[in-house]
A protein has these predicted regions:
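Conserved GNAT acetyl-CoA-binding A-motif
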Residues: 109, 114-128, 274-286
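Conserved N-terminal entry element of GNAT/NAT acetyltransferase domains
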Residues: 1-19, 152-168
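Amide-forming acyltransferase catalytic core, primarily the GNAT-like/NAT-type
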Residues: 141-251
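Conserved acetyl-CoA-binding loop-helix of GNAT-fold acetyltransferases
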Residues: 92-95, 101-114, 258-272
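Active-site/acyl-donor-binding loops of N-acyltransferases
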Residues: 75, 133, 139-157, 241-332
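Active-site rim helix/loop that mediates acceptor-substrate recognition in acyltransferases
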Residues: 22-79, 188-223
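A short, well-structured alpha-helix characteristic of acyl/acetyltransferase catalytic modules
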Residues: 15-28, 168-184, 323-324
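Conserved beta-strand in the GNAT
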Residues: 57-61, 66-76, 89, 94, ...
Length: 332
């Protein structure tokens, strides 16, 4: 690896620099959007109530005023070993093509971690699409998580339960369900998901589906959010991404310790088209999340998107899937 040739400084990626970065990264992370809609999707995420305070894109700029690397930085509230803290989430790490092999990816990661330490972060995290080796050299450790297929019992038809579309007023109930599942249990790491963070995760997926609507398999992608009520509030819910390839269960919750209402929601949704074969349903299913009696988890494998953490302060990194509670919805 060649040494860094020029001094570099960390700046917010804005204006012409941001446009160049979007041009360079469009082919990798556009998710089937047009170039204009890729820019709109990124900008809209940062304008959400949660994103405007917790999400920024940065660039490394050299002495010539030229950007050489970029990354998104998220400040995510989390709990590690019973202590509330902040995770510096790192996403879309990218080095300008002609500058690769000079260590700029590691430099921007290290500078963002140093910056986040001053903002209260005790751990840094990322999802790797390029394997583990590069990030291991930078001090990251792989955190195991599971990916599963979900089979839903359809033998007895749909239960007599009202399922409706989720709304903004349901978000506090969703946050409460998550807190109940992740506090006071033998669990080492989980996000602290408040209504604003849940709304951000939903908005990100809805924006992607809306901006990408059109011909082609990705243009048929939809985000569906359903709840079952008890009284006047949500008692169980699911968030799904529906596409030509099947369903992805992005997140779910149930006030019922056994999860029976969650299972019933999925039965109701499948009963909308009773004559069609059940779609393939995939999920990251946290091991401490109860499996509803109507569901069966099969084909368990390590999650294909590799989750890695690096300590910033004196903390221990979880090393078992049993220790982590994390939904696909919070991928960054």
């Amino acid at each position: 690896m060649a040494a860094i040739q020029f001094r570099v400084r960390l700046v917010a990626a804005e204006g012409p620099i941001l446009e160049e970065i979007l041009d360079a990264t469009y082919a990798i992370w556009s998710e089937g959007l047009t170039r204009d809609n890729y820019a709109r999707w990124n900008a809209a995420q940062m304008r959400t109530a949660w994103g405007k305070d917790h999400l920024r894109r940065f660039a490394l700029v050299d002495d010539r005023g030229r950007w050489v690397a970029s990354a998104k930085r998220y400040l995510l509230p989390m709990r590690l070993d019973g202590v509330d803290g902040v995770m510096c989430g790192l996403g879309a790490v990218f080095t300008r093509r002609e500058e690769r092999g000079r260590g700029y990816a590691g430099e921007i990661i290290n500078q963002l971690i140093d910056r986040s330490r001053g903002e209260g972060a005790t751990v840094a995290g990322l999802f790797s699409e390029i394997g583990e080796e590069l990030y291991r050299r930078l001090g990251f450790v792989t955190v195991p998580m599971d990916e599963v297929d979900i089979e839903v019992d359809r033998k007895h038809g749909a239960p007599a339960m009202l399922v409706r579309s989720g709304e903004e007023r349901d978000l506090p109930a969703l946050a409460s369900m998550h807190t109940k599942r992740t506090e006071g249990v033998p669990l080492r790491f989980a996000l602290r998901r408040d209504p604003a963070l849940i709304e951000y995760a939903l908005s990100k997926k809805r924006l992607l589906a809306g901006l990408g609507f059109g011909p082609g398999p990705r243009g048929a992608r939809q985000t569906e959010f359903f709840v079952a009520e008890e009284g006047a509030s949500a008692a169980a819910y699911v968030v799904l991404t529906v596409s030509a390839g099947g369903w992805t269960l992005e997140e779910a919750g149930d006030r019922d310790p056994a999860g029976a209402r969650l299972g019933a929601i999925l039965q109701v949704l499948l009963a909308r088209e009773p004559s069609r074969p059940a779609p393939l349903i995939r999920a990251w299913w946290p091991r401490l999340m109860p499996v509803p009696p109507q569901l069966r988890l099969t084909n368990r494998i390590p999650a294909r998107d590799i989750f890695m953490l690096r300590p910033i302060e004196n903390v221990r990194i979880p090393d078992r899937a049993d220790d982590v509670f994390y939904w696909r919805s919070d991928y960054f």
